[in-house]
Each structure stands twice: as structure tokens, then as C-alpha cells.
């Protein structure tokens, strides 16, 4: 019975950590990364199509992303989708390929981005704490229903707290690494 509670919080906290890592991939750091283009959907002949299914994406230099649509007629649609994606990059189009030049970030912009990443980390920590609260409520209800003893309830809450602390520590580690990446010139 308790194992189900532990498995559930491990699963939920693991997913929360993965979501945080995926969210961080979309944060600009001054270096070109194809992750910036994740989630961009192009209206291709009336069908919403992910950009990576319409074009060849590459990073030939550290500050340049090159997008080469397989269908040259879709280049305007791709350009429009990039502009609508609000990734703070302006595409330049030569008729065959689209180039996204990543400008170097100013010190103020770096600090602003680091602050935003910190907020994201805090939001995910709150999500972890909510998962912990739900697990503790479940344990309390199980004790009340007589499914577990008081000792098992305390031991369960202790284990839930340790798991929560571990995941919050992982979020902090991921955040620190991303912050370092953002702030380095």
C-alpha cells in the first residue's frame, strides 16, 4: 500500500523534473541551439506541421541556425511561423534557406534571463511540494482509515520528505548549471 504512494510520487516528481529540463532547453543562452525551434509549428498547406518535419535544421556556427525547407515554396510559411513563435529572432531568407542569427546577449539581458530561469525553478519546486502535500494527505487518510499504523505513517512521511528533498536538490543542480551557462560570456 505504501509502495504505491512512493511509486506515485517518484513518477510525478520525475515528470516534473523532466518538464523543467525541457522548459530550460527553450531558454536562449546566446548560443545557437535547435531546441529554440522546438514547438514551432508551420501552417503548411493548411496543416499544422512541426518545423523539423518540413526542413533540414542545422547549426553551422555557434551563433547561427540554418533552416533549409525541403519544399522551397514553404519558405515564407516557415519564416512566418518563426516570427509568430516569439523567440526574439528575426529570420533572414535568401530564397533557399533561412538563417537565424543569434545576437550576443547583453549583461542585463543575461541577468534577466537568469532571473526568469530562477522563477521557473521555483515554480517547479512548488509543484514538487504540492506532490509531497498530496502524498502526505494520502498517508494521513490511510492512517485514519486504519490501513497503516501511526509508525508507518510517520515513516512514510519521512520517506516522502526525503524523496522531495532529493528532487528539489536536482532542480537546484539543473538550475545552477543553466544559470552558469547563461551568465558566462
UniProtKB/Swiss-Prot annotation:
GO terms for molecular function: ribosomal large subunit binding. GO terms for cellular component: cytoplasm. Keywords: Cytoplasm, Protein biosynthesis. One of its GO terms (biological process) is translational termination. The keyword Protein biosynthesis applies. It is found in: Cytoplasm. The keyword Cytoplasm applies. It holds the Pfam family RRF. Responsible for the release of ribosomes from messenger RNA at the termination of protein biosynthesis. May increase the efficiency of translation by recycling ribosomes from one round of translation to another. Belongs to the RRF family. This is Ribosome-recycling factor. It comes from Desulfosudis oleivorans (strain DSM 6200 / JCM 39069 / Hxd3).
